[in-house]
Amino acid sequence: QMIVHLGSLFRHNLRTKRQQITLEEELDGLEDYIYLQQMRFDGRITVEKSIRVQPAAVLVPSFMLQPVVENAYSHGLKSREEGGRILLRAWMQDNVLVLTVADNGKGMTAEELDAVQTKIAQSEQTGRSIGLGNISRRIGMLYPGGKMQIYSRAGHGTVVRFELPQTQQPEEKE
């Protein structure tokens, strides 16, 4: 089963050439990644989803969610012996797709959060990428008025929030 999911994740990564894909496609690729992490962490970390949009009807930057979920596992939850939780939510607010990825991990102090946001801003300007900087830069290019915001509190977890104005319709699949 693990090999099947790993192969599927590789295929998703290799065949996705477009800058924007449907949320449905993004979630499909994310499922394989989550499965592999569930095996790695022996099910200690639960992932819940609350998707209140038609995933095939909205566009997101390709490879937007996996780095955020990866950060939740790697930085927020990995060291928690009692396990943890990641909650992925999506909804429409006016004509804006709002997505949040929240974890109940170790969180960050105000100083740590400030350092992360500084790194993101620097990577946006230089083009030298850290994962979140790459995502933020692509949101700025693809979604005028789009945003990525990070909220965190030490001992309580982190939330990454995306706001993506939906001005285009997904193309029909061939």
Segments and roles (model prediction):
Residues 1-149, 159-161:
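Two-component histidine phosphotransfer core
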